[in-house]
Amino acid sequence: MSKKKNTKKKTAKTPQAKTKRPVNGIIIAAVAVLIAVAVAVAVFLVKKNDKPEPPSVNHVETLAPDGSKYTYAEYKGTKMPVEFVEILNNAEQDSYDACREYGVALELGDREISLPEFVMYYYDVYYFQTESALYSIQQTGANRTGYDLYKLPTEQKHPREEYMWSEQFTQEVIENMALNYMMFDEAVEAGVELSNSDISAVLESLQLIERGAKSEQRTVDEEIADTYCEGLTADMYMAREIVVAYATAYDAAKHADYVDSYSFSDVEAVFNKKPVDYAVARLRVYPIEGEYNEAEVSEVSNEKEFLEYANKNHPRDTYDANFTTECGYLTKQRLSDIYGTEVGEWAFAKGRKAGDIAVVQGMLFRYLVYMEVPAFHATSCDIMFVGTQYDENMTAETRKQEFEKAEKMYLEWKNGDGTKEGFWDYSTSANGMGEETVRIGDYYFEIDNWIHDPSRKSGDSVMLNTSQGCGAVYYIGKNEDDFDWIKTIKETLATEELKAYQQEVLAKDYEAERNRAVLNNAYDTADISILKHQKKLEEKEKQNK
């Protein structure tokens, strides 16, 4: 079973993720959390007269073998896999040609961005927004994102702004693109090298596209163009994957350098200003929509009645209150961001106890809230874990069989040896990780909730089943002085410092200039692919009815 509930935490402005591309042949994972979008408005420059020269044809010479898994060549003074160098060189020529044939949609510093490249980024932003809306519908029964799935971005106004969704998407494109290129350029200048696993991930994305194209009996370029638009080549698409991989690696390395630069006294000084900001609490939250029956709500006095009330009053028969109302461990700020400051204030009020229940007027609704675990300062914990990942296409019966098989192994240990040493043997023989140190957020929340419950004792064990997989956990103990707030504050300080650095470089060398005539053509071009995607959504919706 996969360990992480979410991907690596973002730094200040992490370069756009390279996963979840909506190209045929690439499986798109369900969005794990509702995406909150916050972007900066792009800065515009007076149009420059000088234009980039056609790229020179670079003959790629491989470097001498050094025993590495991959064959390398040089790209602008930096060692890269030869496949990457060839793709980047080809993409540079393709981009130049696309600018001449389809027009320059944007200029980012001294880079020209063609209409096809803009459409690629724009369509992906659109796609992620639709995933967010679909997730909202899945979790709450309603689309709370403000984005209409069946209207074009140019046809609908953003609910919190004075402009259309197309402008929102354009701002995101500019920010993502500028940051990707800026961090990539910095990475190349710094001589950053990717790990073998990162290189493999990029090459696998190309192989996925190739398999998808083969299944449709067309070329990779045709596959890419069908998803995005005419003029976008496979090399241009893959160049972005490479750019993002290096940008992300450099972002992570620079962030880590900042983190390592802070002393404990630096961190403690921040913590002492407001310790409550670094505590976490676990509660259930149910939005009371429609008619509010105060008498009915007042009869809810425990967790069982809370869940019964939520299941009874939710409009969807398939609603699972036990899963959906569970928040996991959240800080006051995070809770306030999701439900409103009133909910955060209630949860972290002095004297709050487990079992407390209230109706709180929050950001969007009245919320019925139930306190599971009052606020505390979490630490890392040592555990052993062995799990089974469920395939998303598994039937309920197959999942049941997988769980029963895993549970049988767990019970054989539990009812037999039952010791820590025995669990280690059981875990490692079943491809477990042995002993590991974990923090809140490292596992799916069902597992997280069990591990980090303050009542947990050394030697506790459990077999847990989740929507993603099942796993057996052995609790070794809590690391008393290894508080999460130490890590949180260091990462926050590093994020702020990295953000300042990024903004300084972006403002100096990557300011954006729009070509509005070409952008209008780009919107029309993107609409063709968006309409195709909307048709697929409609067909899927009909099938689910």
Where do the language-model regions lie?
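PPIase-associated folding chaperone regions across multiple families
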Residues: 18-29, 44-101, 219-292, 330-404, ...
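Hydrophobic membrane-insertion alpha-helices, especially the h-region
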Residues: 29-41
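Peptidyl-prolyl cis-trans isomerase
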Residues: 296-342, 404-447
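N-terminal Lys/Arg-rich, disordered targeting/topogenic segments
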Residues: 1-23
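N-terminal targeting/tethering segments
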Residues: 64-231
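Solvent-exposed loop/turn and edge beta-strand elements of beta-rich ligand-binding domains
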Residues: 17-31, 112-131, 145, 193, ...
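Sec-exported extracytoplasmic/periplasmic mature domains
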Residues: 123-131, 174-193, 204-218, 242-259, ...
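Surface-exposed intrinsically disordered loops and tails
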Residues: 139-162, 323-325, 333-348, 443, ...
